[in-house]
Amino acid sequence: MFLQIAACFTVIGLLYGLVSNLQQNRRLAASLPPGPPGHWLFGNVPPKNFPFIRFAELTEIYGPVFTLRFGRRIVCVVGRHQAAVDILVKHSAETTDRPRAIAASEMLSQGFRILMTPAGERLKKYRRAFHTCLQPSAAATYKPIQYNHAKNYILDCLHDGKCHLEHGRRYAASVVMYIGYGKTTPTSYSDPEVQEVNKCLGRLSEVIKPGAYLVDTYPILKHIPGYASHLWRYGREELALYTRQANAVRKQLEKDEAQPSFAAYLIENQERLGLSNDELAYLSGAIFGAGSDTTAAAIAVMTMAAACYPETQARVQAQLDEVVGSDRAPTFEDEEMLPEVTAFVLEVYRWRPVSAGGVPHRSTKDIVWNGYVIPKGTEIIGNLWAIGRDPELFPDAEEFRPQRWLNENGRIRDDLKYPVFGFGRRVCVGQHVADQSLFINTALALWAFKISQDPAKPIDVLAFTDTANIRPLPFTLRFEPRVKDIEAVLEAHLD
Ligand code: HEM
């Protein structure tokens, strides 16, 4: 008898939940931006592949902001520049938060990973710590090391152009290992330490894919013993790895042998910054996670664009020849005089944005936009792929056309922006370091080489990995030296 009554109450409870859920959905739907219809209970089906491309198609149909529903989760996708500014920049204070990511953040990262840290005290202290080491004046101090590694990239491409993607990855890994841990020697992707970090990042990349784990739709699963227990194990392994790396710097500091680095700064200021050992370990590791593959992918896109758009490449080279010539190599000091290089980089960012789908934000208050209400708790995706294809700002968006970034005087336009580094208070903390990397590698690569395709292996400009941060699938390039004795000229500069 008792069991029957309990069952009755459970069924009534479930029905009540269902009905109130439906009523809530109907109420919300009336004020939300429009979107494709979905199942009355489960909502829309997340795209299986390349969600940013599917979302860009939906932007064409439903407009600058459209709504999707996944179970109880409401997602607004922003696909036009002005709407992104209105919602994610002007309302930055209310959109700093991240959506709850149970599998990727709470289980795999034990809540420590900055990328998924919700708005609040932990995020504030994380970003404060980064700001000190990555703001423009601090970023400028990394220029010499970036230059040295960029020079290695050029020499690697000269001697072994087949492995150009690996050389770009080596550049990026070397720079972030220097900033993160003070490692001064070049870092190879085959280093066991880097391989271990990459194993962890590869796992994250799988777990973070929309719809990868049911627990993100049904949070109760987190508490079911045995459910996705490998995620907890992976999380423990990752924390142990970052702790080992931070402890190595701690030991160097004790022996007075440490190079200046982000980890050293965190350790020396741990108490003042209010960081636990685990937070400190994860934060030091974040530089590699966030800055390595992204930078390498952008460098790869730069070479891809140069090979596929030879006339555009030649335009940059004409300016390099005029300003720099061939007796010396370009340096950071030439930047002001090389707007064609900067325009090329800006177009690389727009044409194939590395963080193509953007990193989701979450509203912590109702936001009124264009007569619609984006309610508190909505996930907001700034779809960078679609924003870079905004026809009002970027006509013929599929064309790689750096000239769109230049004004009639050949200077960089200050009225055109593209948010490749994200939005508002969540904007990428490494943007200045990344800009420096892209500038110097582009300037040196286009000064040193005529980069072209192998006619026998034409490049597919849409062949990219289907991952949270996209990167080109392997492609073949030819590096034809434009400067006599590149090696000697580069060495002379360093002497
Ligand atoms: C071309 C290279 C890069 C691109 C395209 C890029 C892009 C991005 C984007 C789109 C975000 C998310 C912003 C948002 O939520 O709106 C982000 C976050 C982040 N980036 Fe970068 N990034 C690059 C390089 C770097 C580098 C070199 C570092 C470190 C030295 C770095 C560190 C971070 C960190 C720590 C975050 C998380 C910030 C947070 O969640 O509060 N990134 N980046």
Swiss-Prot record:
Q: Which domain of life is it from?
A: Eukaryota
Could you list this entry's UniProt keywords, alphabetically sorted: Heme, Iron, Membrane, Metal-binding, Monooxygenase, Oxidoreductase, Transmembrane, Transmembrane helix
Quote the pathway field: Secondary metabolite biosynthesis
Name of the top EC class for this enzyme? oxidoreductase
GO cellular component entries: membrane
Which residue spans traverse the membrane? 2-22
Compartment(s) where it occurs, according to its Swiss-Prot or TrEMBL record: Membrane
Membrane topology per record: Single-pass membrane protein
Question: Which prosthetic group or cofactor does it need?
Answer: heme
**EC code(s) of this entry:** 1.-.-.-
Molecular functions per Gene Ontology: heme binding; iron ion binding; monooxygenase activity; oxidoreductase activity, acting on paired donors, with incorporation or reduction of molecular oxygen
Role description: Cytochrome P450 monooxygenase that is able to use 4-ethoxybenzoic acid as a substrate for oxidation.
Family membership: Belongs to the cytochrome P450 family.
> What is the official name of this protein in its record?
Cytochrome P450 monooxygenase 113
Q: Which organism is it from?
A: Postia placenta (strain ATCC 44394 / Madison 698-R)
